[in-house]
Amino acid sequence: MFTDTINKCAANAARIARLSANNPLGFWVSSAMAGAYVGLGIILIFTLGNLLDPSVRPLVMGATFGIALTLVIIAGSELFTGHTMFLTFGVKAGSISHGQMWAILPQTWLGNLVGSVFVAMLYSWGGGSLLPVDTSIVHSVALAKTTAPAMVLFFKGALCNWLVCLAIWMALRTEGAAKFIAIWWCLLAFIASGYEHSIANMTLFALSWFGNHSEAYTLAGIGHNLLWVTLGNTLSGAVFMGLGYWYATPKANRPVADKFNQTETAAG
């Protein structure tokens, strides 16, 4: 039932590992692109959200954030939160090693950070209408995120990436417009519910940092948020999705390392 999708994920993990090993610059550029694409979505939804009544703000922001993951998937790029799922399948299927997984994940995260900050810088240099006004929701939301309790951030991070990886998983299992509908629904649920995505937060934090933020907004607070949200994102991508669907697949139908590697070799 899930074998074909797991094979796609494991094959993508092998592709990611090859790109990282054979073309490190290309891997970092592609990772930066993912951070930038998510950042463009963040700028969009906060621009709209800043104009709206709080009662409808979560719905509208959630309904328009689908552009972020659509760009990542359709244009192609390396997103940390998706990699937590892909690389887990790769390890279980034998297409990559544990060592490769733990070497690639931090590189992807840092590449995403570069792209996220770059987009925020461009927005700031371009006038950044959200940034000079201290009452902008960019500043209030960023501050609230950096002062939230660790366990709140951790579990909101877990719920968030469960939805993000479900969007990616369903996009792999569908064709045509169904891909976009799957992405749209999952990201609507993530944003409207107020969950935490480490890469999306990177651009938000950079935007507030470049603007007229409160003195209570600190680098330590940003680090606090990104640490716990990243851990929560990793839990759901690797365990809820990667291990979850691996063990939901009957053992006889799971990819076997030798067979998978033979398929990869035959495919070039």
UniProtKB/Swiss-Prot annotation:
Predominant subcellular localization, coarse grouping: membrane
Transmembrane residue ranges: 26-46, 60-80, 113-133, 152-172, 180-200, 226-246
Topological category with respect to the lipid bilayer: Multi-pass membrane protein
Keywords: Cell inner membrane, Cell membrane, Membrane, Nitrate assimilation, Transmembrane, Transmembrane helix, Transport
Coiled-coil parts of chain: none
A Pfam family annotated for this UniProt entry: Form_Nir_trans
GO molecular function, one term: nitrite transmembrane transporter activity
Cellular component annotations (GO), alphabetically ordered: plasma membrane
GO BP terms: formate transport; nitrate assimilation; nitrite transport
Topological region Cytoplasmic: 1-25, 81-112, 173-179, 247-268
Periplasmic side: 47-59, 134-151, 201-225
Similarity field: Belongs to the FNT transporter (TC 1.A.16) family.
Alphabetized NCBIfam families for the sequence: fnt (TIGR00790), PRK11562.1 (NF008595)
Functional summary from the UniProt entry: Catalyzes nitrite uptake and nitrite export across the cytoplasmic membrane. Is up to 10-fold more active than NarK or NarU in nitrite uptake for subsequent reduction in the cytoplasm by the NirB/NirD nitrite reductase.
Name the record gives this protein: Nitrite transporter NirC
Source organism of this protein record: Escherichia coli (strain K12)
Organism lineage string: Bacteria, Pseudomonadati, Pseudomonadota, Gammaproteobacteria, Enterobacterales
Gene: nirC
